[in-house]
Amino acid sequence: MKNYEIAAMSRKELLEKIDELENRLADINFHKAIEPPQNPMVFRNSKRDIARMKTRLRQMELQESSNA
């Protein structure tokens, strides 16, 4: 997921997408323990997407608190 796509998301959309990606990451971890992954970059990219989204959420929180 690209940064401009994340920046365009609302708070609710970000929370839903983070939840979805964390569930997918748990599935990937489970399958990784059983057999080697076909594409190990999926794990890495999922972790990075989650981090980007959490960073964007934090930026939104800080922006709201500074405006209030």
UniProtKB/Swiss-Prot annotation:
What protein name applies here?
Large ribosomal subunit protein uL29
Concerning Pfam families, the annotation shows: Ribosomal_L29
Quick check: keyword Iron-sulfur in the entry? no
Gene Ontology CC: one annotated term: ribonucleoprotein complex
Keyword check for Ribonucleoprotein: yes
Q: Which gene encodes it?
A: rpmC
The entry's family comment says: Belongs to the universal ribosomal protein uL29 family.
Q: Which GO terms describe its molecular function?
A: structural constituent of ribosome
Can you supply a Gene Ontology BP term from the record?
translation
